[in-house]
Amino acid sequence: MRQRITELLVAKAEEQVVTVAGWIRTRRDTGDFSFLEVNDGSTLINMQVIADKSLGNYEEEVKKLSTGCSVMVEGVLKESPAKGQSVEVHASSVTVVGWADPETYPLQKKRHSLEFLREISHLRPRTNAISAVARVRSRLSYAVHNFFQEKGFTQVHTPIITTSDCEGAGEMFQVAATGKDGHFFGAPAGLTVSGQLQAEVYATALGDVYTFGPTFRAENSNTSRHLAEFWMIEPEMAFCDLQGDMEVAEEMLKYVLADVLEHCVTDMNLFDKFISKGIIERLQSVLAHDFARVTYTEAVDQLLASGQKFDFAVKWGIDLQSEHERYLTEQVYKRPLIVTDYPAAIKPFYMRMNEDGKTVAAMDILVPGIGELVGGSQREERYDLLAERMEAAGLDLEEYGWYLDLRKYGTVPHAGFGLGFERLVQFVTGMANIREVIPFPRTPGFAPC
């Protein structure tokens, strides 16, 4: 059975027989020896394999290996005298599993731009940067689940196909399959924009729940910050107010950041050196300080008083743009910032109305380099007020009767938030374009495989 390189690198070199399988990164020949750099994807670090002319296929195959070829190596793991590596494998056999023609294989031994790699998204995981993103993304996902499980939350699998538009913005992809009455599900259905409403169903029965899954927006935004398909982390907590919501969100973010810094050292060093210099120090600073907090009204006043010229004019009642959010986090507070109590007119119907009748108990967490990372609120638990806001938003109360029933039978204060997973991966890795942090980006005009 093959052993992962990441495990062999920390093993004691007691001249044990091992099997390594992976892809050739480089080959160099010296006299009667070939030095193969093999990577199996378990770590950024390659395993050096030393093959000599005593191998039966040395001249015919080993000396013809090139970048991208796949091999199975058996040999003895030994302590390496070479600088920068702890162990190496002295091969007793090298089996070529698959060839890669160096004339046509697009990933040769040189640095490729991230824009070029997007054009070959089926091969880009074989590069250092994108494989490192994949491992960090996996670890972040693991840490998210660990956090909520340790907190006693129950994971709920909310539907991908739904007849409800949580955001009420009409940006849903429609499901086209039809039945005898014209609609397969008996009503117009689309791909979910959020699992929040369904998560509220289970929060008002199980207490604390979370959902973590794909969401979809038919928004024609071809920017470095938007995707048509992305993943969302959405907890919902019964008997919880906005204060509790903010505390859980900040605690969760710090938990997953600490986890990645501990377990993805090699990959994070790559990002720190080649992608975003100082990213590790910036993340450590996030862990060391409380998030700043300010109301929307105070934030607008600070922007107006700054003298800064923005592309989008600032006034009370606007939806803060990325340039406003980044100015606040990067220039004013220089750390993550929680903005609360937004105007009701720019927020969805389900957010709890504040006593002033103008703002809602909402919060956004803004982070340097990204802008909005988390959006949450205390939900409106009062039947009459919720029904009034739904009517004002043009929603059919009969169609959303199930949602109103949660307030009709045993209503409780509850709160939750949504965290865009790809933006979290961006924040951690320092990647400038969101297309680099999801395995298969879906954007307007682009869905290659």
Curated annotation (Swiss-Prot):
InterPro entries given in the database record: Aa-tRNA-synt_II, aa-tRNA-synth_II, aa-tRNA-synth_II/BPL/LPL, Asn-tRNA-ligase, Asp/Asn-tRNA-synth_IIb, NA-bd_OB-fold, NA-bd_OB_tRNA
UniProt entry keywords in alphabetical sequence: Aminoacyl-tRNA synthetase, ATP-binding, Cytoplasm, Ligase, Nucleotide-binding, Protein biosynthesis
GO terms, molecular function: asparagine-tRNA ligase activity; ATP binding; nucleic acid binding
Record-linked SUPFAM superfamilies: Class II aaRS and biotin synthetases (SSF55681), Nucleic acid-binding proteins (SSF50249)
Gene Ontology cellular component list: cytoplasm
PANTHER family: ASPARAGINE--TRNA LIGASE, MITOCHONDRIAL-RELATED, ASPARTYL/LYSYL-TRNA SYNTHETASE
Name of the protein in question: Asparagine--tRNA ligase
Organism: Desulfotalea psychrophila (strain LSv54 / DSM 12343)
